[in-house]
């Protein structure tokens, strides 16, 4: 047992400790930045100085530091999170590593993301579930391309809180002038980022522990908070509950003939018993009869809560549909603009069909055109015929059916989607909806002869499937 937990158990008892832990707020954050900026070492220092490391873990770190460490005589705290053999041998981070810890004020989930350019897709994956980005900068090297790239991706993925931690201050003699030079350079770069972002810039030394958990004695000229103080006090809970009610249906819960509910997680906003709702894309309406949870019925469900909704009317709702309040204005379209992060060696090519998964909805779509590709270094744009590995571009998409969706900045769950290769079933990209475009009309010219023949065959030999006549539908 680690010493922090021991102290709290001694003070509160087991019941008091569990109760206090249950009601703490949760912050998900990632560490990102360029290669060797000290991301893994910073997380190791956070865990070590907040007394979250077990004695056997610390002993293993001391032992491994002699064999594969990179910090000389000192224990290499990066080994606490760099667990893959290849990571330890090369002294780098490859995969996203998750660590969990808590203080008396808050619970944390940390995503330690890789700094190398070829692992940008791993960084984007880690950032997609986070509330805050800790962007590491080496005080000797200053702002690098990968610093800009990770800042841009974090901004693209809707993160509203950035902590820019200027690390390795011990290697520049804790120079205030060097800190202010890098701070001003980053603030100038950040003017190109979109949205209302809260940016905090602090000096730290992850190796020595200065200004990570405790202030230390070497940065007396800095009057701001330590990194842990910032993480404990940043307000993200309000943002999670803000916004209009969105409830993507994950599955229809039918345990017996007397119960039919719709299970899922509230993506944003809240819903109460008695609220008038509508299901999209059908537009059918009803009212909420019950909100069912594992612990029994509740009167109101907030964002982040997994529940089953039952309705007062038997309306047709299936997996992938979206439940919203009756007066909500939600776009339903098969034509959209989205920023895409491409994650595979084979480039994204316009015209090729991919499986698209938005919330619980799965459909098929293709890129009509790539409007532009972003230059990560200066955030400018240029034309592109295809999108390469780790490329980020604005693409115009056409889907095979209309889907209810939001802009990603308004609701990540209903505005974000993954792109899946139809042959290999591998996730090849991630998309963030920027704008819904005018719905495209599909005619008979868009349907192949094979699809029409297959539709006729199904209706003839499998009438109980109740398949619609495709040729008649497309004439309407």
Swiss-Prot record:
Function statement? With CysD forms the ATP sulfurylase (ATPS) that catalyzes the adenylation of sulfate producing adenosine 5'-phosphosulfate (APS) and diphosphate, the first enzymatic step in sulfur assimilation pathway. APS synthesis involves the formation of a high-energy phosphoric-sulfuric acid anhydride bond driven by GTP hydrolysis by CysN coupled to ATP hydrolysis by CysD.
* PROSITE patterns named in the record: G_TR_1 (PS00301), G_TR_2 (PS51722)
Q: In which pathway does it act?
A: Sulfur metabolism; hydrogen sulfide biosynthesis; sulfite from sulfate: step 1/3
Q: Which reaction does it catalyse?
A: sulfate + ATP + H(+) = adenosine 5'-phosphosulfate + diphosphate
Q: Where is this region: G4?
A: 167-170
CDD domains xrefs? CysN_ATPS, CysN_NodQ_II, CysN_NoDQ_III
Q: Where is this region: G3?
A: 112-115
Q: Which is a GO BP term held by this UniProt record?
A: hydrogen sulfide biosynthetic process
Q: Which UniProt keywords apply?
A: ATP-binding, GTP-binding, Nucleotide-binding, Nucleotidyltransferase, Transferase
Q: What is this enzyme's EC?
A: 2.7.7.4
List every stretch annotated G5: 205-207
Q: Which InterPro entries match?
A: CysN_GTP-bd, CysN_II, CysN_NoDQ_III, G_TR_CS, GTP-eEF1A_C, P-loop_NTPase, Small_GTP-bd, SO4_adenylTrfase_lsu
Domain tr-type G residue range list: 24-239
Gene3D superfamilies attached here?
Answer: P-loop containing nucleotide triphosphate hydrolases, Translation factors
Recorded protein name is Sulfate adenylyltransferase subunit 1
Provide a Gene Ontology MF annotation, just one.
Answer: GTPase activity
Q: Name one Pfam family in it.
A: GTP_EFTU
User: Subunit structure of this entry?
Assistant: Heterodimer composed of CysD, the smaller subunit, and CysN.
Q: Does the keyword rRNA processing apply?
A: no
Which parts of the sequence bind GTP? 33-40, 112-116, 167-170
Which NCBIfam families does the record associate with it?
Answer: CysN, PRK05124.1, small_GTP
Region (G2), start-end ranges: 91-95
Outline the segment boundaries, as ranges, of region: G1.
Answer: 33-40
What protein family is recorded?
Belongs to the TRAFAC class translation factor GTPase superfamily. Classic translation factor GTPase family. CysN/NodQ subfamily.
Q: Does Phosphoprotein appear among the keywords? A: no
């Amino acid at each position: 047992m680690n010493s922090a937990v021991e102290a709290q158990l001694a003070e509160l008892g087991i019941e008091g400790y569990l109760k206090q832990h249950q009601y703490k707020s949760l912050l998900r954050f990632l560490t990102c930045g360029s290669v060797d900026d000290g991301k893994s070492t910073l997380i190791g220092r956070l865990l070590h100085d907040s007394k979250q490391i077990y004695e056997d873990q610390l002993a293993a770190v001391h032992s491994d530091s002699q064999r594969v460490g990179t910090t000389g005589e000192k224990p290499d705290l990066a080994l606490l999170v760099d667990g893959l053999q290849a990571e330890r041998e090369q002294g780098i981070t490859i995969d996203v590593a998750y660590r969990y810890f808590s203080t008396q004020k808050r619970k944390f989930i940390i995503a330690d993301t890789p700094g190398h350019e070829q692992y940008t897709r791993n960084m984007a994956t880690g950032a997609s579930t986070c509330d805050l980005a800790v962007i590491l900068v080496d005080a000797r090297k200053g702002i690098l391309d990968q610093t800009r790239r990770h800042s841009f991706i974090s901004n693209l993925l809707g993160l509203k809180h950035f902590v820019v931690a200027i690390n390795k201050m011990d290697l520049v003699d804790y120079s205030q002038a060097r800190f202010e030079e890098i701070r001003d350079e980053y603030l100038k770069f950040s003017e190109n980022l979109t949205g209302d972002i809260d940016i905090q810039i602090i000096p730290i030394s992850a190796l020595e522990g200065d200004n990570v958990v405790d202030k230390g004695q070497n940065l007396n000229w800095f009057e701001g908070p330590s990194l842990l103080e910032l993480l404990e006090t940043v307000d993200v809970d309000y943002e999670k509950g803000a916004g209009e009610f969105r409830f993507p249906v994950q599955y229809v819960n039918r345990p017996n003939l007397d119960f039919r509910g719709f299970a899922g997680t509230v993506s944003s906003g809240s819903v109460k018993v008695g609220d008038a709702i509508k299901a999209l894309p059908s537009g059918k309406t009803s009212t909420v009869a019950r909100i069912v949870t594992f612990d029994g019925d509740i009167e109101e469900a907030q964002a982040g809560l997994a529940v089953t909704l039952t309705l007062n009317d038997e309306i047709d709702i299936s997996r992938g549909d979206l439940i919203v309040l009756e007066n909500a204005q939600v776009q339903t379209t098969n034509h959209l603009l989205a920023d895409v992060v491409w994650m595979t060696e084979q480039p994204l090519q316009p015209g090729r069909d991919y499986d698209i998964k938005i919330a619980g909805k799965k459909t098929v779509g293709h890129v009509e055109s790539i409007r532009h590709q972003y230059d990560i270094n200066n955030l400018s744009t240029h034309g592109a015929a295809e999108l390469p590995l780790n490329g980020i571009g604005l693409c115009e998409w056409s889907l095979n059916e209309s889907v209810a969706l939001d802009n990603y900045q308004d609701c990540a769950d209903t505005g974000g989607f993954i792109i899946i290769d139809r042959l290999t079933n591998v996730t090849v990209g991630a998309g963030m909806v920027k704008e819904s475009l005018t719905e495209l009309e599909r005619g008979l010219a868009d349907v192949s002869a094979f699809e029409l023949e297959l539709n006729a065959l199904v209706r003839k030999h499998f009438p109980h499937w109740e398949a619609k006549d495709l040729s008649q539908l497309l004439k309407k």
